[in-house]
A protein has these predicted regions:
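Secreted/luminal cysteine- and crosslink-motif detector
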Residues: 5-7, 22, 237
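Bacterial N-terminal signal peptides
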Residues: 13-24
Length: 359
């Protein structure tokens, strides 16, 4: 068992308040029920117990038949994984129920799962409009108002314990620059101020208070007299939500930490429990954008990155470090008592992981 003592850690707490104390969190022998990547992840706290959640994704064979809708739940207090009810789909697409590139987040003790896309044998992909609330103790999915514009490979950011922002992403045939705002109190959608950069998919971002930061992803380039192509987009945009009108976001561009894009990073907004500094952290990903099997659009195998970027919201400055763990193909970053983790993902040589990754 790995034991963490608060006095020995640089303690971070997420926007969701997490207590700082000596506690055993993870067993090194604990593995997920199955290898999974491109899975939506979230964490919820119910009755003072933390749960880590994985929704849908891709199995170890990495083909269309390995796209699934499984739900895996990790009970932190018991150091135990369980497979639970599968993520529903209102209207199966050509009989397909599994999906990739869904996104998830949490408000209070409820997780929210958005979209994703199905993959057919002929490689056709369809964005799913479904939205579900997941209640972990009851193991129950509750259907909610569908997305006005179905997206996958997007970002879901929670705000004020009520709203969730879906920023950009892919819709069926191309990227969109929309910021779709879901109100959990009214179960209604509205459009927020659009994303100011090039529309992307596979980007990453986090939020602290009313400040959010979005970085990188993949854009679509259109060419003269030939087909369009995918290209890495290295750009970061900071947004400030108007607390009196949450649909209004003031956007501006910030300096990129390296000038080199990373695709499908894990990211999260954090507050340092000692210094109270606020930052957005980006971990892993790959410099080479790729198809869902981990092979680059350029035909070369994509390699995971060990880079960690930390953006300080007060100073507007970046800190770049490296992790001992290089992973990619993530949809979110989780945090417990100072430790940053991802669930599954891909390692070198496109290996689909069956573990909790520690950074």
């Amino acid at each position: 068992m790995i034991k963490f003592n608060c006095s020995q850690l640089t303690r971070l707490k997420a926007v969701l308040i997490i207590s700082a104390c000596s506690v055993n969190f993870f067993s090194t022998a604990t593995t997920m029920p199955a290898p999974v990547t491109n899975n939506a992840v979230a964490q919820v706290k119910v009755n003072n117990h933390w749960f880590l959640l994985s929704f849908s994704g891709l199995g170890k064979m990495k083909d269309y038949q390995d796209v699934h809708n499984h739900t895996y739940v990790y009970d932190v207090s018991k150091s135990q994984w369980r497979e639970r009810s599968s993520v529903p789909i209102k209207h199966p697409i050509n009989g397909l129920i599994g999906r990739l590139a869904s996104v998830a987040t949490a408000l209070d003790d409820v997780a929210y799962v958005f979209g994703g896309y199905t993959v057919a044998q002929d490689h056709s992909e369809v964005s799913v409009p479904d939205v579900y609330a997941y209640h972990v103790l009851e193991d129950k999915f509750q259907a909610l108002a569908p997305m006005p514009v179905p997206v996958d490979d997007s970002i879901a950011l929670p705000y004020n314990n009520r709203y969730i922002y879906l920023v950009s992403g892919w819709h069926n045939d191309g990227n969109i620059n929309l910021v779709q705002l879901y109100d959990s109190k009214t179960n209604q959608w509205q459009q927020a101020s659009p994303f100011p950069g090039k529309a992307v998919f596979g980007h990453a971002g986090g939020i602290v208070g009313n400040i959010l930061l979005i970085c990188d992803g993949v854009r679509v380039d259109v060419h003269l007299n030939k087909g369009r192509s995918y290209a890495a987009e290295s750009a970061c945009y900071r947004g400030e939500i108007n607390p009196l009108m949450p649909s209004k976001i003031s956007w501006y561009k910030v300096k990129h930490p390296t000038g080199k894009s990373r695709y499908r990073m894990a990211a999260k907004g954090l507050i340092d429990s000692t210094s109270k500094s606020k930052e957005i952290v980006f971990i892993g990903g790959s410099h080479n954008p790729y198809n869902y099997n981990g092979m680059g659009y350029n035909g070369e195998p994509s390699i995971p990155s060990s880079e960690i970027w930390r953006y300080n919201l007060a100073t507007n400055k970046w800190q770049i470090t490296h992790s001992k763990t290089a992973t990619m193909d993530h949809r979110g970053l989780l945090e417990l008592n100072g430790e940053l983790v991802t669930l599954g993902g891909m390692a070198d040589k496109q290996q689909v992981l069956k573990r909790i990754n520690h950074y």
